[in-house]
Amino acid sequence: MLLAAAPVRREYFSCIDGLLATMANYFSSPYGLMFIGYMGFEYLSDKPGADTFGEKLLYGVGRYSRDALHKYHHVKTSWCDAENYRSLHNTIVHSLLNQVPVGVYLDSFYCPWNLAYQRFHINHYVLVIGLDMGNEAYICLDPYASAGKYKLPGSCLQKGFREYILFEKDPSENQEPLSLCGILHENYYSNAYIGRFEKNYSAILQFADDLSHNIDIAHET
């Protein structure tokens, strides 16, 4: 079982960005507008329970691109916690039978092709596009790593899973041609006049100040 999804890989993409762009293209709705609403940098110096810089950064790219992915490309995403490995496996099989890949969270410590494999616990996401039943493995795309396909042993997913992402082409959305000028106008003014720029700039200054005084690379990794 293998779906014909082609990875979308860009140097500036996070792992989630790559998955979302890949799915937009898979549903024949090229991803070009999914970042249009994003302009931001979010950092909470005193975030409760966070003791590393990575935990204090808020990854707004994923949130904004998901909103725009639905609004402009009509691709809905549902982020779900996996109760256990068996239920996750059944969800993957069901979605693949319906010709839709599934995004899965995978701790990089258990991702064999990742540089952090067996070294560091880092949040990561891959896209399951098929099954290799003979080897009890999942066939995955990981645009963040390369444009190739990877086989993920079931034992690795069982140790490193947490949540999954379901994708759906929303037929209820208005499919009329989009007005690019109107979209640009809307997003420019929403970014410029709701105070987002000033907030982002203040967060950048706070992050730079904290980083210059408190960075401990060993603790961060």
Residue map of PLM features:
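Cysteine-nucleophile protease catalytic domains, especially the papain-like/related folds used
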Residues: 1-85, 179, 183-186
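Active-site-adjacent substructure of cysteine-protease-like catalytic cores
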Residues: 12, 26-54, 85-140
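Alpha-helix initiation/capping motif
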Residues: 16, 107-109, 200
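Alpha-helical structural motif
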Residues: 19, 61-65, 88, 116, ...
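Charged/polar, solvent-exposed surface patches and flexible loops
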Residues: 22-25, 67-71, 90-94, 159, ...
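Hydrophobic transmembrane alpha-helix bundles
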Residues: 68-80, 117-122, 141-147
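Alpha-helix capping and helix-coil boundary motifs
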Residues: 81-89, 176, 196
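Noncatalytic regulatory segments and standalone regulatory/sensor domains
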Residues: 132-221
